[in-house]
Amino acid sequence: MSYYDPQGVIPYVIEQSPRGERAMDIYSRLLKDRIIFLGTPVDDQVANAIMAQLLHLESEDPEQDINLYINSPGGSVSAGLAIYDTMQFVKPDIVTTALGMAASMGAFLLAAGTKGKRFALPNTRILLHQPAVGGLAGQASDVEIHARELIRTKRRLNEILSEHTGQPYDKIERDTDRDFIMGAEEAIEYGLIDDIVRHH
């Protein structure tokens, strides 16, 4: 299978060919049309699948756009940054489209699409906030190291968001200090997306 599904519920489609019928999982079928679907929280396994698909589609045709559809509550910062770096690394333009919810790292990846090719469906909710940290425990020196790393990561995420949205760094820093929820129209004004898609 080409995609990680934690619930194990992956629809299959039947494809007709001159050699007969063939069953194919929906994510593999979408991949044939250069569509990658991020519909889960972002973790290392999901990130590896998405990075592999991005690299595969680049090797198939480095000139044709790749479409990344996002309906994700976010997740791991390191996994999300790995996807982000791969999106910036590959040659094709990355068309991002949010549907449902693009929260946290989901919103970050939405904004990371190619400028002019970042979209949302009309009722999408987009949420920005600062990276979360679990309960830190251990020696004080270890907690201090992790706290410094969290601050450095937050700064880097805000720099990247500022670069992709055109918003001043200070505004991004203020807005991500708490949950900052936007609709599609507000996301256009903010610079996270470029347009709202109403019809295919």
Swiss-Prot record:
UniProt keyword terms in alphabetical order: Cytoplasm, Hydrolase, Protease, Serine protease
Q: Where is the active site?
A: S104, H129
Q: Which InterPro entries match?
A: ClpP, ClpP/crotonase-like_dom_sf, ClpP/TepA, ClpP_His_AS, ClpP_Ser_AS
Q: Name one GO cellular component term.
A: cytoplasm
GO biological process, alphabetically ordered: protein quality control for misfolded or incompletely synthesized proteins
Catalyzes what? Hydrolysis of proteins to small peptides in the presence of ATP and magnesium. alpha-casein is the usual test substrate. In the absence of ATP, only oligopeptides shorter than five residues are hydrolyzed (such as succinyl-Leu-Tyr-|-NHMec, and Leu-Tyr-Leu-|-Tyr-Trp, in which cleavage of the -Tyr-|-Leu- and -Tyr-|-Trp bonds also occurs)
Principal cellular location given in the protein's record: cytoplasm
Tell me its EC number(s), please: 3.4.21.92
* PROSITE patterns reported in the protein's UniProt record: CLP_PROTEASE_HIS (PS00382), CLP_PROTEASE_SER (PS00381)
CDD domains reported for this sequence: S14_ClpP_2
**Gene Ontology MF term list:** ATP-dependent peptidase activity; ATPase binding; serine-type endopeptidase activity
What subcellular locations does the record give? Cytoplasm
Record Pfam families:
CLP_protease
Tell me the superkingdom of the source.
Answer: Bacteria
Gene3D superfamilies named among the record's database cross-references? 2-enoyl-CoA Hydratase, Chain A, domain 1
Does the UniProt entry include the keyword Hydrolase?
Answer: yes
What enzyme category does the UniProt record give?
hydrolase
Self-association and partners: Fourteen ClpP subunits assemble into 2 heptameric rings which stack back to back to give a disk-like structure with a central cavity, resembling the structure of eukaryotic proteasomes.
Tell me, what does this protein do in biology?
A: Cleaves peptides in various proteins in a process that requires ATP hydrolysis. Has a chymotrypsin-like activity. Plays a major role in the degradation of misfolded proteins.
Family that this chain belongs to = Belongs to the peptidase S14 family.
What is this protein called in UniProt?
ATP-dependent Clp protease proteolytic subunit
What is the organism of origin for this protein? Answer: Rubrobacter xylanophilus (strain DSM 9941 / JCM 11954 / NBRC 16129 / PRD-1)
From the broadest rank down, the organism's phylogenetic lineage runs: Bacteria, Bacillati, Actinomycetota, Rubrobacteria, Rubrobacterales
